[in-house]
Amino acid sequence: MDFTEAYSDTCSTVGLAAREGNVKILRKLLKKGRSVDVADNRGWMPIHEAAYHNAVECLQMLIHTDSSENYIKAKTFEGFCALHLAVSQGHWKITQILLEAGADPNETTLEETTPLFLAVESGRIDVLKLLLQHGANVNGSHSMSGWNSLHQASFQGNAETIRLLLKQGADRECQDDFGITPLFVAAQYGKLESMSILISSGANVNCQALDKATPLFIAAQEGHTKCVELLLSSGADPDLYCNEDNWQLPIHAAAQMGHTETLDLLIPRTNRACDTGPDKVSPVYSAVFGGREECLEMLLQNGYSPDAQMCLVFGFSSPLCMAFQKDCDFSGIVNILLKYGAQLNELHLAYCLKYEKFSMFCSFLKKGSLMVPWNHTSEFISYAVKAQTKYKAWLPHLLLAGFDPLILLCSSSWVDSASDDILIFTLEFSNWKRLPSAVEKMLSVRANSSWALQQHLASVPSLTHLCRLEIRASLKAEHLHSDIFIHQLPLPRSLQNYLLYEEVLRMNEILEPAANQDGETSKAT
């Protein structure tokens, strides 16, 4: 049954008269002996109707008819007594009548809400004072989840109410079921004046909720810069860890949520142990996780490392690896990290293949991702295998950049899954007559079912091809990042093109690497 909507056909005539404040009709009904305790579909009796609708005379008549404690304290199906309803609407006179008739100022609803809490919620300071005069308790739980009236006043930013409650002895450090204090609530909702009053009264600026979050952390998370400023000037500790794993700080919250002004306040005040320290998490990760380019650049400009530390919490070896996990376009994040010197490795190439960012893959090759020691070769190969169907978009670039084709050819997963065209193309970057025995064995097995591969393996590499391999092997790795260096060699253009495998690319109907780019390139370089 719906306890929030009043059905008129369930309300008694006495209840309707009280609801409408019709004293004349109510008097007639009472003289006829009509009952005053008939409830409607919500459990509302006439006394509830009169209290809610501010029908003072009707209420007095009802109490005169039945002044018993049971009637005065009768509750609706939601646990509201007449006092709750009167206070919720800010009816001072009704509240006074009920209190003098014996209503309990500390009675709770089914949701554990007290009249004092409802008075704070309604913003009626006069009703609040009336309840306090009649013994309302300012401490303890006043609503579900353990919120106290001081929590609610802090949430609403009602300075007069906060001062009154504190004056009456309200505990400034009272906690709800989650360990949250009124100061935390004020910080969360940006109530600067509430915070100022609470701090002036001695509230602990470094209090922590059950999840270890502090007022400074929540203010930073919500971007309440003035609140952050007040907390810092009042002694809040920006290095107090705000989670069980002892790594999360206010600076992380600001960076993740994109609050640049707040971040600007926290950067110079936060200890740099979080930057690259072991078992910590750099706020650079937080900025990347939130996709906050401006915050990321701010951190890097202020000296935070673009490589941070290996992040076991998120399962990434670097912020650049994390960037690939974003659902949105992450090229801007990648650009910023590279701008400030992020180190590239094979994992980043692997993620380019995983997410089919082939132009970014080519850009990473040009930036020297093949020059660093490889520690994740198996992971790279696994993604390379999955990207075989689109090999023309990335494999030529990889091999032309100096990648050793034997790394692929030594992998059974690559050889077993690759088409004949892919295997033959890969072999073109090697001396296929001098392959390791294990590779020869795998390829011979494949060749048994492939005439084209069998024919290629049986052929003898030309002298010009072997010379090409030797010349390319003699070049420094950085000279193979692009075709610029080779085009500058004192050789005929035809030989330059030969060193760049132009005839192999043409035979395989592959666009020249310089032309095989799309709109993604400009974003990735």
UniProtKB/Swiss-Prot annotation:
GO CC aspect terms: cytoplasm
Phenotypic consequence of gene deletion: Asb3 deletion mice have a down-regulated susceptibility to experimental colitis and a preserved intestinal barrier function. In addition, these mice are protected against influenza virus H9N2 and H1N1 infection.
Gene3D superfamilies per the UniProt record, alphabetical: Ankyrin repeat-containing domain, SOCS box
Family assignment from sequence similarity: Belongs to the ankyrin SOCS box (ASB) family.
Subunit composition and interactions: Interacts with ELOB and TNFRSF1B.
Described function: Probable substrate-recognition component of a SCF-like ECS (Elongin-Cullin-SOCS-box protein) E3 ubiquitin-protein ligase complex which mediates the ubiquitination and subsequent proteasomal degradation of target proteins. Recognizes TNFRSF1B. Plays a role in the down-regulation of antiviral innate immunity by targeting MAVS for ubiquitin-proteasomal degradation. Also destabilizes TRAF6 by enhancing its 'Lys-48'-linked polyubiquitination.
Protein name, as recorded: Ankyrin repeat and SOCS box protein 3
